[in-house]
């Protein structure tokens, strides 16, 4: 039974470990299967890289295949790749965190080194010895070996990486997809407002290629944003002649000479809005349209329909037209008119003279087709291919003068060789679809046709055809996930390795070389380490609570390498785009300078293999909404009509309305229901995981919803978790997908359970067969990345039957498998003595007393014992100059005991460091002589607790360097760990043994085996030991064979358990590899209890945040008529201006939920024969219209009582996003609970006992305690560190700094005339070194007088003036006491 309220059929029973099903107001059908794995974005990407469930077409395999084989420069030998193998991690995830090491796996590759037999070697060629039988080169040596190339950080089961013992997350990056993009400057470049069009070809790897118009409509290109050149240079560098260029970009029109002029084909599209200077006549000479008459497209179509196919142009009518090809004198071969030239009156005379009968003209009409390419070509029409290549080379590599072959090779490498240029499959698909090409997807370099088509499309844009691309459209942006990042880093490492191998090959003696000699495993490890440690996208995981973990793994960032920078990103890229619908959450984003650049994946969205985000929709066929779910890309979605999930449908899933609002092409349109193609799968599919947890989200302003989403991630897990009474139904999904809970791997029965372990005997229910034992080790009081406490608690009990993926243990901020970030508290919206002014919060002391918002935080402190030049440091209890009382909580070794209460300046680890010998006074020398040993030869370097920490020691880890003698405490800790390993092994063996011996007894009983001396088998079984059972019944051959088979299976499982145990012990005994010079590391974990106090920040889920201003005694708080004091008072003025009305609706619904629970409690307390019937009747009214109603009807009386008792504290509600209950439904529930349907009640002043004048909104709201705790922010300084140069106290809590007394504060003292106070602030309390020593002496002596010296800042100023060659000297004498400047 899941907490989502699914039905379990007749005889329904609510398990103890299940949450109470919620009263849900959801109307749409939910596709829950898509939500089972919220971190699939991370896991799938990494699995694709390492080759899990992959055909080897990408990832590690493809990198190795691209790199190998590697040949030496002369071709004498070759290093071939055979295969690769990924090993097992040396330590598990928990052990890596504990040891502070990286969770990684070794990668080994099998290499084959082949050396050929050669006859002769020279710099020009190598002559090989050829095998006479095969006619192939003869092999001299062939050596194959498996070689380690380093360790690869492995992703944990939670989608994180453990790097140096710290959990990190690789954030996915949104970047512009490879391909071609067309854009315009939107008229901003020139004051005339003329649109300047441009195109950019972006590869995945390689040089960028830009095309652009200038103000004169000349087309230029740039490579890597260098100096621009005319595009004709690029086309000619590709080998195109002038005629080739004209043929590629312009259509030809053939003019044929006749007696009256030129006969021309009539093309309708050429006459759109044309005004001819001559009469339009047909070939017969009939005038169809008079000269200077404007011919519209309608007229042209009518002429064509009337049969006009050719028309006449007068001889002079071709003036100004562009010739498509050279016009040549037939007799002499001389060129009369060159291709691209315009016809003049002189040319017309020559054409008549040389009897030219047919001319091909370029179809340039200056309206639909412009002469842009032609004009560009004529900038330098005599340029050759070689000239163009050299010109391009000079722009990119200025200052070099290479030969033609080098230039050609360089140009080819820019765009046409896969080693230097890679469009990627995504880029090729985008290029093909954009330009209408049909190039193979595996061709990931540019072709000549690609470049020509890009220029063609750019010219068409200038001619007014088509539209520019929207770079913020999600069809033009893709996601790079963790697998792709690691693959790129892996490729970089392997390329470095390849260069090293080639260098080594040029100098090594092949006769003695082995494959392992060529490979340096540190190369790849260094590249991967740099990425995981220092990349902007490799981030310290937000581990405040389970929601913050999930959100961090689903985050999308536009920042990072290859992405945007926050300073240059404009409004457009940050804004919400229509294609974000169902793909990227429009709500959840940071509030600061990263707003819009960092976002979150929507709930149902997934990323396809090309990196584009897809959103699911239900298919509609003939007005019927089917259950078929299809995922659409942003570029596909615009072509369809997609209805909202809230569209009304009948019982047959047919649309009720004939007309529906749909999304189409980024707009909302009204269409017939027959034309609808798809419908949204759920109203909440547009929001992220965090936003989907906010009930009544639709009633909140978007800015407050954003704050609510972000602040849920800052909620600290509390001492006792409590699920919200008013939720959204997503709580269970988030908890299960976060990894904070423990889910059962297989079906089975709980065999053993305690605070640290759950042991489940897994079995196949159909075959009644034991499949093995699943042992779950729970995380107990572990420290998270943000110092919050991770603690898992079992929710199952002995004998419970669990199914796969059932929640068997809760984690931090989890309540029976549901996310529980805060507490349900009784709230009143009113003012109270001004203490809730400006969002301040008033809290009842009863809340503090009951530890409602108390949280546990775990601090880690580390003590490092080093080997110094004077000798090793030592951990010891007898620390010099420390009294015995301060050492009382240390053990004999000198390490604090677990369970000790420690406070500021308590010693956690006693440690002494050797110091150089000093000259001793006579009395000390006497002691040394008497006792025969040195004294005071070491100094106290113990680990002390910082001044702002107070708590309980809950754990101690001691790591001793391998080879160094272990102390008693480390041996004790090791023995404790071995005991836990023994416990795990014995648990597994006990379960298996019990199952097999039960099966053995069944076998012997069914076979009718007789045992001598016993009348029946039961008496024998009662006395016989387990070992005796195995030797019973062996006289029967059939029974003996079955017993033997069973024994072999039993021994195999037990042997495996012993093997795993020995492996763990061996790893523990292996010791620890510590940094150079470190002998021992001691880590002490202190649990700090944080009670709620003034200054702590609290918030609801609707962006209603505030700071606690006062904790009022419970007896003084306003109370209800029955005397119940409210827990929290919020300012009602904080609601209207913020427009987050969701908190009021939540308060009303929570009030209804609790009062319904109270009414159920009254029915239970009343008892009587009609109690069960009354309960059923009341629950039917509550769950009217819910699926759960039929389950309640099928419950037995006992099950119903259990269910009803769980509802005493309140009936859990679910108000899904965009599907929350309306005010009429809430009023109905309030009436059912027998309270005022307005949701308001009279309150009484707790101090005076008087009733307030009017009713007040009272109810239950879910409040969170955020990690902005006052204990972590406020501090006080008496004496502390000073700055080295200014000698002023440092600032900030981390430096134990003081409060800055700034310029304006000085003005305040001046205004009050407090001269001495001002002098004190500016001198002895700040940077007067001499003065503060004197005032200290005065305090010691009890004297109240003090003298001020010169502040150090004045001396710093003098030094700075001197650095400017201005010598300032301060002079003092009897007559002249002020400063004089020389």
From Swiss-Prot:
InterPro entries: DNA-dir_RNA_pol_bsu_ext_1_sf, DNA-dir_RNA_pol_bsu_external_1, DNA-dir_RNA_pol_su2, DNA-dir_RNAP_su2_dom, DNA-dir_RNAP_su2_hyb_sf, RNA_pol_bsu_bac, RNA_pol_bsu_CS, RNA_pol_bsu_protrusion. One of its GO terms (molecular function) is ribonucleoside binding. One of its GO terms (cellular component) is DNA-directed RNA polymerase complex. The keyword Nucleotidyltransferase applies. Its EC number is 2.7.7.6. It comes from the Bacteria. It is an enzyme of class 2 (transferase). It catalyses: RNA(n) + a ribonucleoside 5'-triphosphate = RNA(n+1) + diphosphate. The RNAP catalytic core consists of 2 alpha, 1 beta, 1 beta' and 1 omega subunit. When a sigma factor is associated with the core the holoenzyme is formed, which can initiate transcription. Belongs to the RNA polymerase beta chain family. NCBIfam families: PRK00405.1, rpoB. This is DNA-directed RNA polymerase subunit beta. It comes from Anaplasma marginale (strain St. Maries).
């Amino acid at each position: 039974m899941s907490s989502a309220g699914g039905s379990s059929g007749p005889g329904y029973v609510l398990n103890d470990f299940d949450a109470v099903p919620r009263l849900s107001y959801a109307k749409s059908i939910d596709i829950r299967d898509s939500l089972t794995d919220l971190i699939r974005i991370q896991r799938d990407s990494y699995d694709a890289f390492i080759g899990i469930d992959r055909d080897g077409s990408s990832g590690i395999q493809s990198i190795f295949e691209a790199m190998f084989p590697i040949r030496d420069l002369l071709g004498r030998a070759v290093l071939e790749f055979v295969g690769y193998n990924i090993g097992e991690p040396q330590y598990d995830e928990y052990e890596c965190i504990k040891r502070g090491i990286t969770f990684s796996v070794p990668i080994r590759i099998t290499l084959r080194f082949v050396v050929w037999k050669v006859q002769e070697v020279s710099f020009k060629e190598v002559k090989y010895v050829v095998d006479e039988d095969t006619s192939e080169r003869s092999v001299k040596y062939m050596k194959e070996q498996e070689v380690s190339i380093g360790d690869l950080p492995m992703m944990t089961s939670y989608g994180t990486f453990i790097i140096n013992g710290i959990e990190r997350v690789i954030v996915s990056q949104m970047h512009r997809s490879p391909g071609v993009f067309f854009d315009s400057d939107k008229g901003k470049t020139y004051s005339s407002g003329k649109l300047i069009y441009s195109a950019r070809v972006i590869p995945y790897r390689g040089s960028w290629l830009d095309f652009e118009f200038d103000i004169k409509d000349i087309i230029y290109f740039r490579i890597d944003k260098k100096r621009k050149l005319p595009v004709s240079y690029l086309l000619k560098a590709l080998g195109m002649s002038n005629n080739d260029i004209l043929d590629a970009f312009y259509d030809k029109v053939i003019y044929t000479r006749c007696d009256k002029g030129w006969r021309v084909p009539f093309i309708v599209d050429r006459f759109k809005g044309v005004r001819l200077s001559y009469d339009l006549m047909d070939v017969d000479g009939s005038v169809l349209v008079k000269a200077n008459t404007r011919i519209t497209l309608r007229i042209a179509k009518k002429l064509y329909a009337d049969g006009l196919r050719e028309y006449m142009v007068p001889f002079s009518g071709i003036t100004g037209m562009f010739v498509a090809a050279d016009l040549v004198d037939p007799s002499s071969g001389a060129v009369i008119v060159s291709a691209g030239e315009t016809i003049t009156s002189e040319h017309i005379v020559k054409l008549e003279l040389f009897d030219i009968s047919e001319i091909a003209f370029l179809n340039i009409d200056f309206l639909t087709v412009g002469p842009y390419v032609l004009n560009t070509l004529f900038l330098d029409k005599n340029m050759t291919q070689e000239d163009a290549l050299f010109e391009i080379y000079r722009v990119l590599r200025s200052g070099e003068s290479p030969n033609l072959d080098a230039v050609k090779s360089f140009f080819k490498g820019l765009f046409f060789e896969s080693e230097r240029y890679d469009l990627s499959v995504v880029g090729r698909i985008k290029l093909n679809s954009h330009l209408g090409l049909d190039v193979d997807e595996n061709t990931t370099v540019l072709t000549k046709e690609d470049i020509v088509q890009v220029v063609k499309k750019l010219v068409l844009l200038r001619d007014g055809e088509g539209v520019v691309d929207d770079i913020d459209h999600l069809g033009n942006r893709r996601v790079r996930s963790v697998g792709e990042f690691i693959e790129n880093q892996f490729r970089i490492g392997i390329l470095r390795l390849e260069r090293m191998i080639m260098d080594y090959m040029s100098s090594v003696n092949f006769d003695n070389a082995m494959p392992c000699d060529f490979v340096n495993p540190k190369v790849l490890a260094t590249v991967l380490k740099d990425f995981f440690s220092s990349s902007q996208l490799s981030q310290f995981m937000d581990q405040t609570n389970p929601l913050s973990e999930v959100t961090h793994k689903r985050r999308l960032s536009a920042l990072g390498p290859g992405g945007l920078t926050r300073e240059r990103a404009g409004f457009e890229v940050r804004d919400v785009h229509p294609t974000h619908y169902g793909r990227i959450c429009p709500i959840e984003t940071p509030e600061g300078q990263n707003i819009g650049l960092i976002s979150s994946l929507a709930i149902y969205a997934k990323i396809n293999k090309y990196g584009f985000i897809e959103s699911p929709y239900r298919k509609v066929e003939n007005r019927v909404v089917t259950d078929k779910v299809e995922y659409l890309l942003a570029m596909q979605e615009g072509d369809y009509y997609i209805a909202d999930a809230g569209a009304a449908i009948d019982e047959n899933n047919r649309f009720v309305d004939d007309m529906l609002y749909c999304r189409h092409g980024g707009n909302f349109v009204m269409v017939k229901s027959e034309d609808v193609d798809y419908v949204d799968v759920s109203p909440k599919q547009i929001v992220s995981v965090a936003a989907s947890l906010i009930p009544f989200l639709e009633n909140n302003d978007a800015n407050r919803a954003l704050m609510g989403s972000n602040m849920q991630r800052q909620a600290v897990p509390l001492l006792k978790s409590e699920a919200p009474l008013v939720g959204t139904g997503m709580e269970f999904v988030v908890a299960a997908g976060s990894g904070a809970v423990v889910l059962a791997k297989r079906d089975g029965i709980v065999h053993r359970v305690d605070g640290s372990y759950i042991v489940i005997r897994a079995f196949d229910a159909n075959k009644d067969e034991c499949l093995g034992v699943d042992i779950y080790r729970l995380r107990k009081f572990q420290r998270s990345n943000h110092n919050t406490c991770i603690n898992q608690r079992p929710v199952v009990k002995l004998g419970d039957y669990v199914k796969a993926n059932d929640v068997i243990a809760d984690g931090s901020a989890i309540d029976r498998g549901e996310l529980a970030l805060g507490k349900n508290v009784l709230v009143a919206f009113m003012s109270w003595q001004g203490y809730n002014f400006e969002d301040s919060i008033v809290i009842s002391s009863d809340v503090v007393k009951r530890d409602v918002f108390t949280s546990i935080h775990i601090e880690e402190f580390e003590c490092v014992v080093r080997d110094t030049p004077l000798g090793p440091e030592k951990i010891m209890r007898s620390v010099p100059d420390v009294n015995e009382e301060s050492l009382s909580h240390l053990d004999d070794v000198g390490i604090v005991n677990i369970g000790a209460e420690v406070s500021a300046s308590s010693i956690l680890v006693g440690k002494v460091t050797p110091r150089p010998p000093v000259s001793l006074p006579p009395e000390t020398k006497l002691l040394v002589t008497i006792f025969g040993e040195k004294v005071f030869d070491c100094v106290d370097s113990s680990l002390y607790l910082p001044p702002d920490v107070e708590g309980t020691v809950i754990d101690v880890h001691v790591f001793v360097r391998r080879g160094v003698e272990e102390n008693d405490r480390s041996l004790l800790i090791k023995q404790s760990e071995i005991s836990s390993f023994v416990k795990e092994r014995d648990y597994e063996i006990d379960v298996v043994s019990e199952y097999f011996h039960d099966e053995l007894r069944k076998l012997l009983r069914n076979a009718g085996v007789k045992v001598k001396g016993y009348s029946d088998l039961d008496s024998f079984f009662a006395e016989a030991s387990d070992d005796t059972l195995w030797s019973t019944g062996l006289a029967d051959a059939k029974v003996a064979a079955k017993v033997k088979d069973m024994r072999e299976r039993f021994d195999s499982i037990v042997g495996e358990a012993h093997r795993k145990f020995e492996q763990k012990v061996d790893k523990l005994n292996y010791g620890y590899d510590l940094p150079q010079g470190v002998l021992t590391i001691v880590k002490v974990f202190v649990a700090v209890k944080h009670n709620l106090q003034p200054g702590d920040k609290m918030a609801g889920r609707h962006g209603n945040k505030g700071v606690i201003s006062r904790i009022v005694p419970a007896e003084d708080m306003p109370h209800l008529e029955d005397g119940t004091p409210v827990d929290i008072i919020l300012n009602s003025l904080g609601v209207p201006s913020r427009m987050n009305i969701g908190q009021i609706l939540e308060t009303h619904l929570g009030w209804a939920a609790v009062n319904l629970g109270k009414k159920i409690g009254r029915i239970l307390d009343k008892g009587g024969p009609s109690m069960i019937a009354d309960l059923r009747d009341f629950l039917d009214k509550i769950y009217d219209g819910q699926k759960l109603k039929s389950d309640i009807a099928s419950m037995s009386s006992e099950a119903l009582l259990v269910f009803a008792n769980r509802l005493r504290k309140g009936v859990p509600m679910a108000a899904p996003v965009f599907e929350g209950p309306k005010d009429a439904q809430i009023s109905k529930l309030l009436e059912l609970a027998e309270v005022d349907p307005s949701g308001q009640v009279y309150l009484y002043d707790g101090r005076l006992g008087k009733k307030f004048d009017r009713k007040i909104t009272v109810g239950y709201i879910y409040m969170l305690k955020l990690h902005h705790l006052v204990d972590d922010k406020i501090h006080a300084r008496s004496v502390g560190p000073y700055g080295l140069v200014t000698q002023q106290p440092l600032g900030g809590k981390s430096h134990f700094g003081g409060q800055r007394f700034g310029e304006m504060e000085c003005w305040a003292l001046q205004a009050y005339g407090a001269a001495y106070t001002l002098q004190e602030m500016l001198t002895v309390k700040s940077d007067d070194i001499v003065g503060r020593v004197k005032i200290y002496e005065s305090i010691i002596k009890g004297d109240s007088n003090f003298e001020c010296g010169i502040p150090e800042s004045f001396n710093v100023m003098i030094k700075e003036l001197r650095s400017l060659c201005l010598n300032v000297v301060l002079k003092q004498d009897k007559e002249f006491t002020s400063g004089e400047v020389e």
